[in-house]
């Protein structure tokens, strides 16, 4: 079983919290059937994954909860405390009075008493009637960061979440949040990979003590919205051949060497294990230099999901 390092999160109030640097993502489109998802999560636990990333919007919280219960029954883990669980507040419920009911619904789905990291999923508020995307402009509203964050802090104070964070937040949004936060965000989860390196935003987060977690670290390859700009890179392929590793392993190692944790998703048993096997080598200065010059392009924009509305384009411009 692979041994995965952990990172200490510095923005968790008075608590010291550690998080495994590689987490298994559980989003899939179209959504995987529950039995397939549960089997994959159990296999991931056997392989050594201890961090699992889900969200209310993914529809995978119940699958993860049932898999955790089964892992306990099978004694793959001795206690729920061995796992680090991240889930997210969906944008349709991103208002002060809905945060507490939302985390309680997630806790029920997951069959756990606390969440390790509760994250604001999107930097917008969506109307509750949203069922399909793109959406009309009036259904995309500015996020009331102050009131929502106060409710997130309450989740932590009540012990329902051990850490709280954000996702897809720009530096200006983080500046606003930090100006009033009693408990600063522990993480900012962002799309990041060798083909979208986000150095300026990462440097900002580091200076503020906010840890960055990368989603789509392989460019969302093999999905309808991703492409092969990472796994198909000639430069990454050249480095992979020289090291006897896969292009995915080189890409994940690069993300890790930036001081960033990773959420990667595969339900393939072999790839699942390969994605953990990145801690027995390092990239050379020459290799890092080559990768720093890869062509840069963001994989998914909010405008491509929600529509080219002014509020959406403004966030895309900063990310």
From Swiss-Prot:
Binding site for NADP(+): 216-275
GO molecular function: D-galacturonate reductase activity
Positions with a binding annotation for substrate: 121
Source superkingdom: Eukaryota
Broad enzyme group: oxidoreductase
Keyword Oxidoreductase in annotation: yes
EC numbers: 1.1.1.365
One record GO biological process: L-ascorbic acid biosynthetic process
Pathway(s) this gene product operates in, as recorded in its UniProt entry: Cofactor biosynthesis; L-ascorbate biosynthesis
Tissue: Expressed specifically in the receptacle tissue of the fruit.
PROSITE patterns to which the protein is assigned, alphabetical: ALDOKETO_REDUCTASE_1, ALDOKETO_REDUCTASE_2
Active-site residues, record numbering mapped to chain: 58
Signal sequence extent: none
Keywords: Ascorbate biosynthesis, NADP, Oxidoreductase
GTP-binding listed as a keyword: no
Reactions catalysed according to its record: L-galactonate + NADP(+) = aldehydo-D-galacturonate + NADPH + H(+)
Function: Involved in ascorbic acid (vitamin C) biosynthesis.
Family the entry assigns: Belongs to the aldo/keto reductase family.
Protein name: D-galacturonate reductase
Organism: Fragaria ananassa (Strawberry)
Phylogenetic classification of the source organism: Eukaryota, Viridiplantae, Streptophyta, Embryophyta, Tracheophyta
